[in-house]
Amino acid sequence: MALDKRIWMHFDLLPFVFIIPLLVVSFLLIFESSAVLSLKQGVYYAIGFLLFWVVFFIPFRKLDRWLFALYWACVILLALVDFMGSSKLGAQRWLVIPFTSITLQPSEPVKIAILLLLAHLIKINPPPFKGYDWGMFLKLSFYICLPAALILKQPDLGTALIVLIMGFGILLIVGLRTRVWLPLLIALIVASPIAYHFLHDYQKKRIADFLSEKPNYHVMQSIIAIGSGGFLGKSKEACTQTKFKFLPIATSDFIFAYFVERFGFLGAILLFAIYIGLSLHLFFYLFESNSDWFLKIVALGISILIFVYSSVNIAMTLGLAPVVGIPLPLFSYGGSSFITFMILFAILENLLAFRYIFGNNSKPSFGNFGFLAQLVRALGS
């Protein structure tokens, strides 16, 4: 049976104009580094796109009552990690699915659960003109801070910070009263030196390495790889930093350095443009004229995640941020982060494609082309 044509009228193709080049180039780099890893990455791509189409047809707007259940299920999984989690590299972050060798990292689906719950709560209680006051702020903060605290205990400082930045970034952008955000800012500044003393030794070492005049070995090799790429990059055979394994974790945490060694400064500029374009396109859904707060918050949350992940990862490889193990979104080797983002984009496309059913913009406004369409209209007027 043919699908209603309005579904495809509202389907936003532009994110995939940004995403597909990322996946193609990423696969090329991973294949050049290891054919075995590229085969695994191909499997992750297949799973990610399969889940995209499965999730795309889930009626999220009708599942309000289930969003709390999803959230608490993810929180329970995070809590179980502390009791029966699997340890890797000194961190206890995974659960082993019974009777299989498959592991699940609950900190990935919890990002989806937090974002959906925030979108639901903001939808039923939109921000007033002057922004949220303490009551609503504290209520929303609880749902952000609880899973972040459980993730921090694993320990996984990087992911915990990502959750906090996404959650509180949404609240700051949609609006908080001055008497809320100003005391919080002061408290954050005062508490930062105190919080440092509660960090693990390896986390303190990463900060010390970042602040020292000489970068640590990993960052130094990354900077050398980036500098050696020149303006147009090198052939595969000439990429000595990657070829001779000087560059650590070249296909995951430091894949940006590998990419710049291969494609040079010009390639880096194009990669920046893709991430900035994708982030802005999603961010500008916030300025649609309708009152579809569920859609706006989901798009805003994905925009923040894309921007923060890419900014922190690139800054890390340049020695401008501590090494925290944050992947380059839709680019680094691995399945967890990629599948999470594909599910998030599936949810966004579902909210766009089926919104005519709920009376939210029966005609597409600028969902198909985002801020680019707005720019074209402005230039033409």
Swiss-Prot record:
Coiled coil: none annotated. It is an enzyme of class 2 (transferase). Pathway: Cell wall biogenesis; peptidoglycan biosynthesis. Keywords: Cell inner membrane, Cell membrane, Cell shape, Cell wall biogenesis/degradation, Glycosyltransferase, Membrane, Peptidoglycan synthesis, Transferase, Transmembrane, Transmembrane helix. The keyword Membrane applies. InterPro entries: Cell_cycle_FtsW-rel_CS, FtsW/RodA, RodA/MrdB. Its EC number is 2.4.99.28. It is a multi-pass membrane protein. The chain crosses the membrane at residues 11-31, 40-60, 66-86, 102-122, 132-152, 156-176, 180-200, 263-283, 297-317, 328-348. One of its GO terms (molecular function) is lipid-linked peptidoglycan transporter activity. GO terms for cellular component: cell division site; plasma membrane. It is found in: Cell inner membrane. It catalyses: [GlcNAc-(1->4)-Mur2Ac(oyl-L-Ala-gamma-D-Glu-L-Lys-D-Ala-D-Ala)](n)-di-trans,octa-cis-undecaprenyl diphosphate + beta-D-GlcNAc-(1->4)-Mur2Ac(oyl-L-Ala-gamma-D-Glu-L-Lys-D-Ala-D-Ala)-di-trans,octa-cis-undecaprenyl diphosphate = [GlcNAc-(1->4)-Mur2Ac(oyl-L-Ala-gamma-D-Glu-L-Lys-D-Ala-D-Ala)](n+1)-di-trans,octa-cis-undecaprenyl diphosphate + di-trans,octa-cis-undecaprenyl diphosphate + H(+). One of its GO terms (biological process) is regulation of cell shape. It comes from the Bacteria. Belongs to the SEDS family. MrdB/RodA subfamily. Peptidoglycan polymerase that is essential for cell wall elongation. This is Peptidoglycan glycosyltransferase MrdB. It comes from Helicobacter pylori (strain J99 / ATCC 700824). The gene is mrdB.
